[in-house]
Regions:
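DUTPase catalytic domain/fold
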Residues: 1-173
Length: 173
């Protein structure tokens, strides 16, 4: 099967890449050093634009290792790196529609950086900060109506209907 080609225009950044051919998403990298503070949000430039066909979108999502271990950072004092450490920060989900033509960015939310804060803290340029997953957009239409309540269990597969329940309503084990 032939792969669909998606045009990427670099604007000071690095080409998104897959570490392995079978990977589901492309790694994306920070374009520049980004100074961060406690409890804040940042739109971090990734240094490229993307031209998506109308039937596709791109999702910027966290990398599992960074969600677990934190985002790499460097602590600077008078222009010198004095410490490198992972900080408590997360990449938030972001959706890129086919009509968007600006530079792609990753939304990063910092949490408590604490004692690590004396001096300037940066997420370094070139950090593999997030993943970009290309997704197909189904051709759908929302219509007004009444949502029917399911009263019975699904006898075919043994599942109980969810109804209004959500947010761990089926338990955690």
């Amino acid at each position: 099967m032939e792969r669909e080609k998606i045009v990427i225009e670099l604007c000071g950044g690095r080409m998104p890449e897959k570490a392995h051919d079978a990977d589901a998403a492309y790694d994306v990298f920070t374009k520049e050093d980004v100074k961060v503070l406690d409890w804040d949000r940042y739109a971090i430039p990734l240094g490229f634009k993307i031209q998506l066909p109308k039937h596709l979108a791109a999702v910027i999502q966290p990398r599992s290792g960074m969600s677990l271990k934190g985002i790499p950072s460097k602590k600077m004092w008078n222009g010198e790196i004095i410490k490198e450490k992972r900080i408590d920060a997360d990449v938030e989900l972001g959706l890129i529609d086919s009509g968007y033509t600006g530079e792609v960015k990753a939304i990063v939310k910092t949490m408590h950086i604490g004692a690590y804060m004396s001096g300037d803290i940066f997420i370094p340029a070139g950090t593999k900060i997030a993943q970009m997953r290309i997704v197909e957009i189904p051709n759908t239409e929302l219509v007004s109506g009444v949502v029917k309540k399911e009263e019975n269990d699904d006898k075919e597969n043994g599942d109980k209907k969810r109804g209004n329940n959500g947010f761990n309503s089926t338990g955690v084990k």
